Amino acid sequence: MKNKFLLTTSILGILLFIASFNTTYGQKKSHGAANKNFIAANWKLGVQMWTFRLFTQQESLEKTANAGITFIEAFPGQTLDKTGKEVFGINMTAADRKKLKGFLKQHHAKIVAMGVISPVNKEDWIKAFDLAKEFGLSYITTEPIKTHWDLIDSLAGVYNIKIAIHEHPKPNVYWHPDSVLAAIKGHANIGACADLGHWARSGLNPVDCLKMLEGHIYGVHLKDIVTFGNKNAADTIVGKGVIDFAPIFAELKRQKFKGMFSIEHESNWENNLPDVIETVQFYNEQLKKLQ
């Protein structure tokens, strides 16, 4: 009888262990799948077209396609193609816009954002929002003058297109998150475009900056630099410079960031597509580690 009791107890113990293991494993697996699904659904990888500023928009779209990227952040002033002098911007004609839509369709690409722009008056801001609406943009990257904060917040609400304040290095007025937060205060449609490289150039820890701007980040400029705290530091391939990206991605995951990472590579201008492709690979590797 005693042996039978011990056997029964042992079997029950084993079954409880198996059940506990399966529950724990299932929870971890479910949590990992949820993380993977959230990132896949809410994180976009794109290219800030300034990266290919030496080329036309048509050529740049071909390059982004070769890098496996379909999302872009357009910049004003980029020539559309080699047939003329038409450029991307608020004064594009209907014919220019139709041409650009054709290029986008050809490469299955979408403009998610544009910038960095700083219109000087209400009329130009309205033109900017009209252009953004026509191409289905999510946000406009800008460094607006203070007297325009109320105006652009109002327009952003009307057009349902967010304003993302960019941060060039000091002495730019927006070099520190404090100044961006000042613009955000009382303006529900104004947030931030987190430029990781420029923060590092200004001697700021990007993770600390992200924490300060939690809940207000609409986009990220994904770049790396060779020297911390030097506003003239050169760009390098993301992951090969001074910026530690693992905690950056972890922090954005913690914040449940929803938006686009725009690769902005301001180096090797004439032949930087391989650098962009390497950045894409680095980004994908980092995402695997998050899951």
Stretches with model-predicted labels:
Residues 103-191, 200-203:
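Active-site acidic/histidine proton-transfer and metal-coordination neighborhood
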Residues 51-53, 76-78, 117-120, 146-148, ...:
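Active-site-proximal loop/turn and secondary-structure-junction residues that shape catalytic pockets
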Residues 73-74, 113, 141-142, 165, ...:
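Hydrophobic residues in well-ordered beta-strands that form the structural core
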Residues 3, 26-49, 53-71, 106, ...:
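Histidine-acidic metal/acid-base catalytic patches
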Residues 60, 100, 128, 152, ...:
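Aromatic/hydrophobic pocket-lining residues that form π-stacking "cages" and hydrophobic walls in ligand
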Residues 1-31:
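Bacterial Sec-dependent N-terminal signal peptides
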Residues 74-99:
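Glycine-rich, proline-tolerant flexible connector loops at the mouths of alpha/beta enzymes
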Residues 87, 137, 269:
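Second-shell loop/turn segments in exported
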